[in-house]
Amino acid sequence: MREIVHIQAGQCGNQIGAKFWEIISDEHGIDATGAYHGDSDLQLERINVYYNEASGGKYVPRAVLVDLEPGTMDSVRSGPFGQIFRPDNFVFGQSGAGNNWAKGHYTEGAELVDSVLDVVRKEAESCDCLQGFQLTHSLGGGTGSGMGTLLISKIREEYPDRIMNTYSVVPSPKVSDTVVEPYNATLSVHQLVENTDETYCIDNEALYDICFRTLKLTTPTYGDLNHLVSLTMSGVTTCLRFPGQLNADLRKLAVNMVPFPRLHFFMPGFAPLTSRGSQQYRALTVPELTQQMFDAKNMMAACDPRHGRYLTVAAIFRGRMSMKEVDEQMLNIQNKNSSYFVEWIPNNVKTAVCDIPPRGLKMSATFIGNSTAIQELFKRISEQFTAMFRRKAFLHWYTGEGMDEMEFTEAESNMNDLVSEYQQYQEATADEDAEFEEEQEAEVDEN
């Protein structure tokens, strides 16, 4: 089987990760003790992608839980599915990273990283055919961002040919935990650009807007935000967990989605959006799902896809529906909005259909877009970074852990390069290539 090793780091990563395991355990008919109570063979057919089978027919998540302080992991352990995880896979320190990237990446995190890698290695060795790793973390704090990126580069060193996939929660001005988030995020992006194959950018601002506008929640809690994230993660991983007509694994997804190695930051979306409390589900049609899925309001990253163009798109539909209708609707969207898709990648929209819908819904759709509009997110962080860095504000917290200002400058310019690369491909057209070829032909003729 093609296994995935899941790692969750830091407070945010552990909270999102715990929700993810709750939702997919439910979808696979696995209860909080790891026992199977399902009703369909499909639930078990690819169960090994995320679960190990233990003695007594129990299913145990192939998850490694990491943090530099014990608090969050205690709450995961005492949470609804806390007993399903393997106790040895909780790896934590006592000191905390204090929202300081340098502590997570260079000092405190570096001390803990080897014991984490031991657990990761153990999980990887028991795999039949490991396809890759997925990490849930945030970029604004200290542990998820600093130690998370340290883990990525160490795992990359040891497993260079395996796919590395991250679900990264990007800080936003509206929902800010700490003032140094722009520093931590920029230093993290600097690492992610080089060391991951696929990164799903999840943005608290976008999640807040969805909860507030669409779901009509007056005071959204982190629980509500994390619920949205876990819906999206469940949708994105559907193809990996269930047999379907278009069976994706992490590598196939990367091949379809990443036209240039650095441009691997995706914008996820989900439809239909219904709040946790509201159970009045109406029967949705495929056209409505398709329409909603491409809507800017449904994006989990606070970027407007209409401000950029899609390089590639993957859509995953779930539920019993006609493939023909799905294909027609997807073509319809592309034809009506052709200016928003780059014309130099033909057939850049891929669609998969899985028969098993998420709990409580007849059908749903998950959207993964590689859009040049994601540059808005990096620009936003970069502006905040520059404002502080120009005055060297808060730098002593980082240099005190042995970091050099040079590293900040490098991270800043790497992120600005990333923005320019997205911009370059946003403006590129197919005719430029034609002109270029004509010029070359002209040169050949002259010679």
From Swiss-Prot:
Binding residue positions for GTP: 11, 69, 138, 142-144, 204, 226
Name of protein: Tubulin beta-1 chain
Binding, Mg(2+): 69
Family per similarity comment: Belongs to the tubulin family.
Cross-referenced SUPFAM superfamilies: Tubulin C-terminal domain-like, Tubulin nucleotide-binding domain-like
Keyword Lipid biosynthesis: no
Gene Ontology MF annotations: GTP binding; GTPase activity; metal ion binding; structural constituent of cytoskeleton
Keywords (A to Z) from UniProt: Cytoplasm, Cytoskeleton, GTP-binding, Magnesium, Metal-binding, Microtubule, Nucleotide-binding, Phosphoprotein
Bias (Acidic residues): 429-447
Reported phenotype of the disruption mutant: RNAi-mediated knockdown eliminates microtubules in fat body cells, resulting in defective nuclear positioning.
Localization: Cytoplasm, Cytoskeleton
Keyword Metal-binding annotated: yes
Any single Gene Ontology cellular-component annotation: microtubule
Principal location class: cytoplasm
GO BP: microtubule cytoskeleton organization; mitotic cell cycle
Cofactor annotation: Mg(2+)
Phosphoserine modifications at: 40, 339
Subunit architecture: Dimer of alpha and beta chains. A typical microtubule is a hollow water-filled tube with an outer diameter of 25 nm and an inner diameter of 15 nM. Alpha-beta heterodimers associate head-to-tail to form protofilaments running lengthwise along the microtubule wall with the beta-tubulin subunit facing the microtubule plus end conferring a structural polarity. Microtubules usually have 13 protofilaments but different protofilament numbers can be found in some organisms and specialized cells. Interacts with mgr and Vhl.
Region (Disordered): 427-447
InterPro entries: Beta-tubulin_BS, Beta_tubulin, Tub_FtsZ_C, Tubulin, Tubulin/FtsZ-like_C, Tubulin/FtsZ_2-layer-sand-dom, Tubulin/FtsZ_GTPase_sf, Tubulin_C
Function according to Swiss-Prot or TrEMBL: Tubulin is the major constituent of microtubules, a cylinder consisting of laterally associated linear protofilaments composed of alpha- and beta-tubulin heterodimers. Microtubules grow by the addition of GTP-tubulin dimers to the microtubule end, where a stabilizing cap forms. Below the cap, tubulin dimers are in GDP-bound state, owing to GTPase activity of alpha-tubulin.
